[in-house]
Amino acid sequence: MGNISYKPLIDDMTWSYSRIEAFNDCPYRFFLKYIKKYSETDKFYSSYGSFIHKLLERYYKGELKKEEMLTTFLMDFSKEVRGVRPKEPTVQKYIDAGCDYLKSFRPFPYKMIDVEKKVVFAIGDYRFIGYIDYLGVDGEGNLYIIDNKSRNLKPRSNREKPTVKDMELDSMLKQLYIYSVAIEQEYGVLPKALCFNCFRNGVFIKEQFDKQKYEESKQWAIDSIKKIEQTEDFEANREFFSCYYICGVNEHCKYDIEAREERRRH
């Protein structure tokens, strides 16, 4: 990309956890999506997650009854879950997981303050925006952030040496710690706990709020943005599954286009 600096565009950005993670996953995807501003195409896995999110949002807003959720899931699956399908056994596994979750669905154990709550806040000198899936409160006035996840996370093992799943959980928790900045700025208090509703495996994870991890997550966000600001060459991180099934801008990616043409030639 030569000596052209995109810093003026980056300096004007409003940040989010997903924007930072796009860069960490593939700098070139960040470039295509947030600098070139290409529209994303539908992908199976992301649209599946969005569909479940939508069903839960409609339930908590009173637009969908509990007994209607499973029927709506089955009737609208083909319309709502779009993009290139993986192999049929994988599609069926996702359908079965959705059915299992909705058949045994239980509302969250905290009174709802808001669902899909839009938050605008600041970390250091940087503007942020986010959407909290569910903000709840218990009988003592403690706040809880709940994030709906299609990823199959596991509760913390509490082993002396963290497991791979523990490290994955800590990585995912950064998002909720960043959202906690918005809660502190709006309500003047921090959440009591951060929770993941893992709807594919039916696991509900509750993590007590850790102030050290909170500060570390804020610093991670600032350091990540500074790294992006200093980036001149947004290089691609090529990985077939992610490029083909996850990346929403792969139709505009010269590296993915070249790779597909190479596969066709062979």
Q: Where in this protein do the model-derived segments appear?
A:
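Nuclease catalytic cores
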Residues: I20-G62, E116, V249
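A residue-level signal for conserved active-site and pocket-lining positions in enzyme catalytic cores
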Residues: C26, I52-H53, Y134, Y179, ...
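A short beta-strand motif that forms part of the nucleic acid-binding face
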Residues: K36, K149-N152, C198-R200, K211
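Hydrophobic (often cysteine-bearing) scaffold residues that line and stabilize catalytic clefts
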Residues: F44, Y48, Y94, M172-Q175, ...
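A non-catalytic, helix-rich entry segment at domain boundaries
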Residues: K54-K117
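Metal-dependent nuclease catalytic regions and adjoining charged, substrate-binding loops involved
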Residues: S78, R82, L169, L173, ...
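Non-catalytic protein-protein interaction segments used by genome-maintenance enzymes to assemble
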Residues: K117-L176, S180
